[in-house]
C-alpha cells in the first residue's frame, strides 16, 4: 500500500510541475482543437450513416 501511495505522490508532483509550469495552457489549447475536430468527425460520420440508412451499431 505504501508503494501505491509513493507512486501517486510522484504522479501528483509531475502533474504539479506541468500545471504550474505553463505547459498546461498549451495542452489545454491543443485539447480544445482536438475536441472540436473529433466532434466534427463524429457528426459527419453520424450524418453519413443516417443518409446511407445503415445501422449505427455494428
Curated annotation (Swiss-Prot):
Family under the similarity heading: Belongs to the UPF0391 family.
Cell location: Cell membrane
Bilayer topology term: Multi-pass membrane protein
Keyword Membrane listed: yes
GO annotation, cellular component aspect: plasma membrane
Record-given protein name: UPF0391 membrane protein GM21_0108
InterPro entries: DUF1328
Main localization category: membrane
Organism per entry: Geobacter sp. (strain M21)
Transmembrane regions: 4-24, 33-53
Amino acid at each position: 500500500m505504501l508503494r501505491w501511495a509513493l507512486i501517486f505522490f510522484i504522479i501528483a508532483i509531475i502533474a504539479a510541475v506541468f500545471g504550474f509550469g505553463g505547459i498546461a495552457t498549451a495542452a489545454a489549447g491543443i485539447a480544445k482543437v482536438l475536441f472540436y475536430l473529433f466532434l466534427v468527425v463524429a457528426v459527419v460520420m453520424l450524418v453519413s450513416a443516417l443518409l446511407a440508412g445503415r445501422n449505427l451499431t455494428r
